[in-house]
């Protein structure tokens, strides 16, 4: 479960860097903050593919993500299994099958740290917070690329680096790559992205 939560952190970072359009690192960072401030809601479908180095195989999952400023997030797998993580203020819901677990973020050091990084991400602070990631930004004719090197011990134990790819023409995040220490690789591709469209409040219900 901890690996899933760390993937959610990365996904949050990706959603808020989606509008970067500049070529210089300083300009990109400025535009990230401005874009995050203007993003009230965000929703999309995603396909997650995990490539297993030792087995020469891959596992494909599909789902949906919803975000509402400033402290609501839902990450839901719909195929091949049903699993949902909902963050609503200081409360977290983890739903798997018929089991629902509700956690108070303030009573768990791990969840409190996860929530901090998530919220820093969605308000555009993650790429400037050196406590969490060392970041390298670059651009080409077709895309922007941000390479994140984890600085927190727990993330360093799992990930060697995280690569965010942005479609330069649309100025939207297109793909996230998580390179694990042992060589496995997870790729998350986003599609049908909607920004500042209404989201049903029930999506973020925690009970």
Where are the language model's segments positioned?
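Positively charged n-region of N-terminal signal peptides that target proteins for export
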Residues: 1-4, 20
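Sec-dependent N-terminal signal peptides
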Residues: 4-14
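N-terminal leader/targeting segments and the immediate start of mature chains
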Residues: 19-57, 202-207
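Gly/Pro-enriched, hydrophobic low-complexity segments
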Residues: 22, 103, 126-207
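Short, solvent-exposed helix-to-loop capping segments enriched in aromatics
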Residues: 36, 113-127
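Extended beta-sheet lipid-handling architectures
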Residues: 44-46, 62, 161, 190
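Short hydrophobic/aromatic-rich beta-strand segments that constitute the beta-sheet cores
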Residues: 46, 73-77, 92-95, 146-148, ...
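An acidic-aromatic
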Residues: 64-116, 186
